[in-house]
Amino acid sequence: MHKPKESRIIDRNQSVLPDITGAIGSTPLVELSRFGKNLNGRILAKLDYLNPGFSKKDRAALQIILDAESSGELVPGQTVIELTSGNMGTGLAIVCTIRGYPFIAVMSRGNSMERARMMRAMGAEVVLVDQCHDSVPGQVSGPDLQRVEDVTTRLVAERGGFRADQFLLEGNRRAHYMGTGPELVEQSSDSIDGFCDFVGSGGTLAGVTQFLKEHNPAIRCYAVEPDGAEALAGGRTDTPGHRIQGGGYLKPHLCALAGIKLDGYLRVSDSEAIQCARELAAKEGIFAGFSAGANVAAAMKLLRSEMAGKTIAVVIC
């Protein structure tokens, strides 16, 4: 076990930030004391929806762009292109606006149109891709995502763009290894026993798990998937049209998770995720989406079983 050598939490009250990207990360950690008062244990919620783009994806967006600049893969004036369910695109729109790159977000029509409007307001070009004929409107499936991938690949070739690929680029995982993980340890006074995360690209789960396991191998880390879309766990995959956006894409292998040792897989139903999201708002004043609800629902399952009496951390994104 090792301790972080110095604080990684930025005290933004001590200086004027040069631009909005300086406000990414160092988000608050809050105990869900009202929500979990009948639970045997604690749930600590990392409020990453307080990032400038309202999600944890701001961290990955910034790190991917910084890495690409450093390596020379991204040159001044080059167009940045990436597929998104909304959050990654918003983060990239912010970072590209500040650092001077045109940005194209490619998005399924099954995703939130509010996010598309937000990205356009920040200067992004948004390309919307129709869902498959047998898809449920508003519920993005694996085949829907493949359509978005195909359009993204074509646009990168046509525009000579830089693909800010959150599924492949190491910056996604590194953002959470260098930021979210150390912040969780420091803010919790090293009291975390477990961590669980709803998996989209896998970057958050991979980066946080890698840091926590290096810090203390006894900390248990879990992947969260939708009930019936359990590709990582090798379980059922007969419900691709679940309502938990941002993950559950039926991808059994994710680059970010290669070599990452997980302690288990948790499945959460639509109704469990939705109910937890509603209760977060009603009981804790935390207004978040269904993926955040899935994280909290999974943490509750752990506290009612193998991790009773422990402290579980989640990200509210």
Enumerate the language-model features and the residues they cover:
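PLP-dependent amino-acid enzyme catalytic core
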Residues: 1-317
